[in-house]
Amino acid sequence: MTQTITSQRPFEANRDAESPNRNLTPITTELDGTDRLVVGGCRLSDLAERYGTPLYVLDEATVRATCCAYREALNKHYAGPSLPIYASKANSSLVMSSLAASKGLGLDAVSAGELLTALRGGMPGERMVLHGNNKSDEELLLA
């Protein structure tokens, strides 16, 4: 039986099913028995209490699924060779580089720091792109 958005996510029950604003929450989002928001098995109020706010929380399952969706869309709609590229400026971290690499994505970087972070996170150098202007000789050599 197929579940509707409403049955899967009662807190999104009033969203238009055709709206681009549907399913904005991570795929593991749920309400616990006390109607507290939970993502990836972690109650968000507990995370806020422990780490303070504002707090940026990512759901690994959602990141992995999104990476796969981009790769699959390119494979389906573009006959030539392609490589979906993660924009490291969104979150230049070892974990995000590792997740993107593990799902077959490439990565764009704007600095030596982003390149080094991606390499340390497991992103193969041949799947990285250095872009932007005003690059130092060291950054160009590293790329």
Language-model segments: what does each one mean?
Residues 1-142:
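A charged N-terminal "starter" segment
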